[in-house]
UniProtKB/Swiss-Prot annotation:
Component of the 30S ribosomal translation pre-initiation complex which assembles on the 30S ribosome in the order IF-2 and IF-3, IF-1 and N-formylmethionyl-tRNA(fMet); mRNA recruitment can occur at any time during PIC assembly. It comes from Corynebacterium efficiens (strain DSM 44549 / YS-314 / AJ 12310 / JCM 11189 / NBRC 100395). This is Translation initiation factor IF-1. Transmembrane segments: none annotated. GO terms for molecular function: ribosome binding; rRNA binding; translation initiation factor activity.
Length: 72
C-alpha cells in the first residue's frame, strides 16, 4: 500500500551498496538510490542484482526511493 502522494515505478536493481541501499534503474532510464522497506527487512526478503522491483518515490526528492516489492 503506497503512502499518500508517493509515486510507484518499476525498475531493475543495478548494484547493491552498503547499508542495505541499492542503485535501481527505472524503466524510463533514470537511476535512483533506494533502500529496502521495513516489512521487507522484517520478512528477510533478499534483493539481488538484476531483480525486478517496485520503487516508491517521494514527490519531493525523485533521486531517492524505497523498494516495496520484489517480483518473483
Amino acid at each position: 500500500m503506497a503512502k499518500e502522494g508517493a509515486i510507484e515505478v518499476e525498475g531493475r536493481v543495478v548494484e547493491p551498496l552498503p547499508n542495505a541501499m541499492f542503485r535501481v534503474e527505472l524503466d524510463n532510464g533514470h537511476k535512483v538510490l533506494a533502500h529496502i522497506s521495513g516489512k521487507m527487512r522484517q520478512h528477510y526478503i533478499r534483493i539481488l542484482p538484476e531483480d525486478r522491483v517496485v520503487v516508491e518515490l517521494s514527490p519531493y526528492d525523485l533521486t531517492r526511493g524505497r523498494i516495496v516489492y520484489r517480483y518473483k
